[in-house]
């Protein structure tokens, strides 16, 4: 009996020490020690932060596909966030981060559970130029029985520069993401997660990334459903049609050869990372820049293990995709990204009006997809359609926001939903978020507290606790729980459900009307339908050489 009591005491002592020191798990490359935390509603959960999933992409590995990680000795301290990837930060207007940045963050309420939990992965946005997985905390998600994972991936030219051949194939950032998805598949069991029930989510560039993973052979079998919040690979800002031209422009800025791609690649690998990222900043066409020219692209036939070999719209129409369910979404004032930033400086809107014809090609992202002879007339058509032909200013600001939102996000999110439903024959859902809560991403960009509407990413910030941001208003808390219920029901059953709402109808394959659910409040949720979601008919009429009008020959005529 005494021996039994001693044995029990030692077990309890061991558990107590484990609790005080933080949770530990063993993954393929070694032992991790995280930390215990408390969720929004007081639930205990474990966080494992700054967990490496690939070798640092430095030196000879810069621009290359991610390389397998070697085992580490001892115990890896996973109790704190590590560096974001090297980037230009639009908010801080400076360069931050490190090239040694390929980390995941794993949050789990039951690291030692017998019953495996569904997994939700979130890919951060930031125009493929800035951001980090650690900016999105698991504190709200941990009120549900699921495992939540965020990740870093290479950004800007370090993640997406391409020489158009095997020297620098491009898409390194997307290959990082795919490598991280495989890491989750192979290791998430050790955190109590179910590798056979993975929901891939992301917002903005992260939402477009989700779409890209549906199209990439590298990511096949790594997830089972997805949510593309406010992002589509059909949007022009998410895909480069002139990657070599842009790569050479950057090489010239940092003093590298542009005549031979081998020499160019070698030179770029030996330039300091900060110099390369700063070179990108020098390429900006306007002083208010929230998008980068270094984005995903189709890779050359000579590239081994390509992420993408077809133009996204072509791949989708060919049905060359992972056939699993999909949710897409928009907010009611998507165009506040980037238009909210125009409010931070009183000189911006007058400058935009004075140079409308020149700047419209950049803010609406058609510099590389519209022939020169059409640019003046298209700029005027946009102003006529959305601003009634009036000057850009505070009086027409709302129209400018809608124009930017429809062009950069909504029209192509709707197009993604309809094509996915038709080609995959899998359940496809759309929602539109129009509830203004206490915090808005637009306030961060505008640097004021004005109510401009429901910004791009406001729904995601509420769910995933960006930065972090929080609210105490009862209706906001109810709205957050409603969105969390949506994600949780979808992650567990494959069917999204919203409390206090009608049945969420799927997108009907082959139909011109797009069915979507409008989320205007926790108790104001309704089904709606539109044959012109995001005013796609107007945007499709302007002659952009994109999507259904894309051809390689057209690229050379611009």
Question: What would you call each of these model-derived segments?
Answer:
Residues 3-12, 90-265, 270, 288, ...:
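Serine-hydrolase-like catalytic core of hydrolytic proteins
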Residues 108-117, 188-197, 257-261, 394, ...:
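Surface-exposed helix-capping loop/turn segments at secondary-structure junctions
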Residues 217, 230, 254, 272, ...:
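Sec/Tat-exported extracytoplasmic proteins
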Residues 2-3, 12-174, 195, 299, ...:
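Non-catalytic accessory segments of hydrolases
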Residues 48, 99-103, 118, 323-324, ...:
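Extracellular structured ligand-interaction cores
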Residues 267, 273-477, 486, 493, ...:
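Substrate-gating cap/lid region and adjacent catalytic-acid/histidine neighborhood
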Residues 46, 99-102, 175-178, 182, ...:
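A structural signal for well-ordered alpha-helical segments within the folded catalytic domains
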Residues 201-205, 431-439, 502-511:
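Short, solvent-exposed turn/loop segments enriched in Gly/Ser/Thr/Pro and often Arg
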């Amino acid at each position: 009996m005494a021996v039994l009591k001693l044995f029990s005491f030692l077990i309890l002592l061991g558990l107590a020490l484990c609790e005080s020191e933080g949770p530990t798990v063993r993954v393929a490359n070694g032992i991790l020690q995280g930390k215990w935390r408390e969720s929004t509603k007081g639930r205990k959960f474990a966080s494992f932060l700054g967990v490496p999933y690939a070798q640092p992409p430095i030196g000879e590995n810069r621009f290359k596909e991610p390389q397998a990680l070697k085992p580490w000795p001892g115990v890896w301290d996973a109790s704190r966030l590590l560096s974001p990837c090297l980037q230009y930060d639009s908010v801080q207007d400076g360069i931050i981060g490190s090239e040694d940045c390929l980390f995941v963050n794993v949050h789990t309420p039951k690291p030692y559970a017998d019953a495996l939990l569904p997994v939700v992965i979130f890919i951060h946005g930031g125009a493929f130029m800035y951001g980090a997985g650690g900016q999105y905390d698991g504190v709200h998600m941990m009120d549900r029985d699921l495992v939540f994972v965020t990740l870093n991936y290479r950004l800007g030219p370090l993640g997406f520069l391409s020489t158009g051949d095997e020297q620098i194939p491009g898409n390194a950032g997307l290959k990082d993401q795919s490598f991280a998805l495989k890491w989750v598949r192979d290791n998430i069991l050790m955190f109590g997660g179910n590798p056979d029930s993975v929901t891939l989510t992301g917002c903005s560039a992260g939402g477009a990334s989700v779409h890209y993973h549906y199209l990439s052979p590298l990511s096949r079998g790594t997830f089972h459903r997805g949510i593309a919040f406010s992002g589509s690979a059909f949007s022009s800002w998410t895909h480069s049609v002139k990657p070599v031209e842009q790569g050479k422009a950057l090489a010239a800025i940092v003093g590298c050869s542009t005549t031979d791609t081998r020499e160019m690649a070698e030179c770029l690998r030996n330039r300091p990372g900060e110099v390369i990222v700063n070179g990108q900043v020098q390429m900006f066409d306007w002083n208010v820049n929230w998008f980068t020219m270094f984005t995903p692209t189709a890779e050359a036939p000579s590239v081994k293990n390509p992420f993408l070999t077809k133009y996204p719209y072509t791949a989708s129409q060919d049905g060359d995709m992972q056939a699993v369910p999909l949710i897409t979404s928009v907010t009611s004032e998507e165009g506040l990204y980037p238009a909210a930033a125009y409010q931070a400086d009183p000189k911006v809107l007058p400058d935009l009006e004075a140079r409308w014809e020149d700047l419209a090609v950049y803010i609406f992202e058609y510099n590389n997809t519209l022939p020169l002879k059409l640019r003046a007339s298209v700029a005027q058509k946009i102003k006529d359609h959305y601003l009634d032909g009036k000057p850009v200013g505070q009086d027409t600001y709302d129209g400018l926001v809608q124009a930017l939102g429809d062009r950069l996000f909504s029209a192509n999110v709707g197009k993604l939903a309809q094509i996915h439903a038709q080609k995959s024959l899998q359940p496809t859902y759309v929602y539109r978020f129009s509830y203004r809560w206490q915090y808005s991403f637009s306030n961060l960009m505008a640097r004021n507290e004005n109510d401009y509407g429901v910004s791009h990413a406001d729904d995601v910030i509420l769910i995933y606790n960006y930065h972090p941001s929080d609210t105490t208003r009862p209706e906001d808390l109810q709205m957050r729980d409603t969105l969390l219920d949506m994600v949780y029901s979808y992650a567990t059953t494959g069917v999204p459900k919203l409390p206090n709402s009608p049945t969420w109808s799927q997108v009907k394959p082959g139909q011109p009307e797009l069915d979507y659910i409008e989320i205007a409040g926790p108790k104001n949720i309704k089904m709606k339908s539109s044959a012109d979601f995001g005013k796609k008919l107007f945007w499709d009429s302007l002659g952009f050489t994109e999507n259904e009008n894309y051809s390689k020959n057209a690229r050379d005529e611009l």
